[in-house]
Amino acid sequence: MFRAGAFASMAMYGMQAWGEILKSPFRIAVINDEITQDFGRACEIAARDFGMQWIELRGMWNKNIVNLDDKEIAEAGRILKKYQLHVTDIASPLFKCDWPGAPKSKFSPTSPQFGADFTFDQQGDVLERSIRLAKAFDTDRVRCFDFWRLDDAAPFRAAMNAKLLDAAKQAGKRGITLVLENEGACNTATGAEAAKLLAAVQSANLMLNWDPGNAAGAGEKPYPDGYRLLPKDRIGHCHCKDAAKLPNANKYEWAAMGKGVIDWAGQFRALKNDGYHLAVSLETHWRGAGTAEASTRQSWAGMKDALRKAGALE
């Protein structure tokens, strides 16, 4: 049901090379720059300390992934090989931009995010670069978004969907699937909105990067409510972070995995029972332990606990 990569024939992924032995139906991963911008150090921690065999690439050496030059790509490949890590996807900033002709989004940043600052007219280049990176790092997935959130996206929604469909077709011709992340600052923030988008954009090469943390931040109960609405055969990636509701406010802040409002054990159990076997990737965001590395270590402990409670980690 779910599209698999190089390890499709394996029912379980054994993760042994550097750390403890982990067995899971999922590709357990972490986004590298949630640990540190030092790519070698991030890979060492993921493999040796976390026992992972998979990693998600977003930025390194203080550069966004799509801005790496050939020398840096080669060096990243050498490091991945050293630590026997496979790449889940390219966490590209594709379509994280303003929609042309629409009112300026209040979410449109005034400075680069994760080292990315690309206009709408540059998105074709971002797509091409992302596909080339996917090929270079031997993955079949590229993360994308659906433009900075508008107060009223309805007049532009059909054109946005057409743009996504065209990009998915371009990617599909080269064996790549786009995984669109539900993101509070973009026009698809929740499971409910994701279900509508997937129904409107019918392409095997456009799937969902399901992010329960982002859905919670947008006011949805991601599991079971948001997840229940999703077409399970179009979930192509999953980000893992937690969110806690601020006291006396209808707002949320990031939390360590297991310390927020999301039923992650239930979510992992449902994914497993629904036949999902692709990535569950730690995207810490929370920095309550003082540093990115310390916070990610603490959040990884919470993620492991939830996976074990779900029967998705041995």
Predicted features, each with a name:
Residues 5, 9-12, 20-29, 36-51, ...:
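Histidine-acidic metal/acid-base catalytic patches
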Residues 73-89, 161-174, 200-201, 264-265:
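Alpha-helix-loop-beta-strand connector modules within alpha/beta enzyme cores
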Residues 61-65, 98-100, 150-154, 217-218, ...:
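A short acidic, helix-capping loop that chelates divalent metal ions and anchors anionic groups
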Residues 5-14, 19-20, 44, 97-208, ...:
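Active-site acidic/histidine proton-transfer and metal-coordination neighborhood
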Residues 34-36, 59-61, 93-96, 146-150, ...:
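Active-site-proximal loop/turn and secondary-structure-junction residues that shape catalytic pockets
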